[in-house]
Amino acid sequence: MAGVCDMAPNFLSPSEDQALGLALGREVALNCTAWVFSRPQCPQPSVQWLKDGLALGNGSHFSLHEDFWVSANFSEIVSSVLVLNLTNAEDYGTFTCSVWNVSSHSFTLWRAGPAGHVAAVLASLLVLVVLLLVALLYVKCRLNMLLWYQDTYGEVEMNDGKLYDAYVSYSDCPEDRKFVNFILKPQLERRRGYKLFLEDRDLLPRAEPSADLLVNLSRCRRLIVVLSDAFLSRPWCSQSFREGLCRLLELTRRPIFITFEGQRREPIHPALRLLRQHRHLVTLVLWKPGSVTPSSDFWKELQLALPRKVQYRPVEGDPQTRLQDDKDPMLIVRGRAAQGRGMESELDPDPEGDLGVRGPVFGEPPTPLQETRICIGESHGSEMDVSDLGSRNYSARTDFYCLVSEDDV
């Protein structure tokens, strides 16, 4: 029977080693449950707690609760709960329970620092700073990003039969003429490559639009209206602007209205109030005192409202001369190309024909030809290579020479 009583217990809890980080002042309950095989002649099983390999003595900082359950087949379940009050650093350590000198898995208690909010506060501040930077970059770079997207993926409006990029309507007063001809037109045409159609007439008259106005609008991709004080002072702007705007929206898509900062003062003109109410149908661009700078937001917003401009790369070279180091084979004299500037004058073997040398570049007076005596029967094959002229396509080059046949003469 002694062998039956020596059967090792089976620990149900803890099933594995556990490590618990607890702050000072906390209370923790450690549960040790084991299944043992018991007979009447076997000693009563008991649970003993060990701390760091030593038996746990009596103390006021812990308490024990033991329970026993007897089941069939002479088996018994014993449970012990150790409740610890972590009041000082000596209460931490490695705890194990033992039944019949057989130890269970361990509970390792280590001291954790007090729950602090420093990390959470720092993380929140970091997220807030990142959001502020993103918002600042969006405000500062929004127009640049939109321009980049338009230049890269925007719709190309080229083969639509239009002759002009924008129709510009303005008042026939000195201030508006100066603004359009000395600020708006140079910036859009010279710096940004747009083609404008300027006209100082009433664009939104009360009567039906004239045939000339319809034709001119049909030739332009966009419409720009300079809403200056002189433009708004016209009687129809206060009386029938709504009817004119409805008629204008039928003729062109999303017209562009240039307003001025001084017009924002109260009372607001009825036409401006109407345009702000229909902002989803029109484009309003505000001119400020600092908008004259080419890099200001005014020009960026105006360019976003205008069609996309396509930049063409220069052609690498004429296919006819690409294999000749981009030199015209008809202009190769004595094995090297005739340069426009910085080259001594070469004799022309045939001044009356089509094998002449390249003329002087812009602004330079023509170099007088030297009188030479050339016999018709002399051979000049060493001075000019014309062996492959018959196989070339001369119709592709019209800037330097032109070949004619006897029938044309």
From Swiss-Prot:
| UniProt entry keywords in alphabetical sequence | Disulfide bond, Glycoprotein, Immunoglobulin domain, Membrane, Phosphoprotein, Signal-anchor, Transmembrane, Transmembrane helix
Question: Which GO terms fall under biological process for this protein?
Answer: acute-phase response; negative regulation of chemokine production; negative regulation of cytokine-mediated signaling pathway; negative regulation of interleukin-1-mediated signaling pathway; negative regulation of Toll signaling pathway; signal transduction
Record carries keyword Disulfide bond: yes
Q: What is the membrane topology noted in the UniProt record heading this document? A: Single-pass type III membrane protein
User: What domain of life does the UniProt record list for this protein's source?
Assistant: Eukaryota
- The segment(s) forming the TIR domain are 162-306
- Annotated membrane-spanning segments are 118-138
Which Cys pairs does UniProt list as disulfide-bonded?
32-97
Q: Name the SUPFAM superfamilies on file.
A: Immunoglobulin (SSF48726), Toll/Interleukin receptor TIR domain (SSF52200)
UniProt-listed CDD domains: Ig
Q: Which Pfam families match?
A: Ig_2, TIR
Note the PANTHER family from the entry.
INTERLEUKIN-1 RECEPTOR FAMILY MEMBER, SINGLE IG IL-1-RELATED RECEPTOR
Please explain the role this protein plays, according to its UniProt record.
Acts as a negative regulator of the Toll-like and IL-1R receptor signaling pathways. Attenuates the recruitment of receptor-proximal signaling components to the TLR4 receptor, probably through an TIR-TIR domain interaction with TLR4. Through its extracellular domain interferes with the heterodimerization of Il1R1 and IL1RAP.
Assembly information from the UniProt record: Interacts with IL1R1, IRAK1, TLR4, TLR5, TLR9 and TRAF6. Upon IL-1 stimulation found in a complex at least composed of IL1R1, SIGIRR, MYD88, IRAK1 and TRAF6. Upon stimulation with LPC found in a complex at least composed of TLR4, SIG1IR, MYD88, IRAK1 and TRAF6. Interacts with PALM3.
Assigned protein family: Belongs to the interleukin-1 receptor family.
- The protein in question is named Single Ig IL-1-related receptor
What species is this protein from? Mus musculus
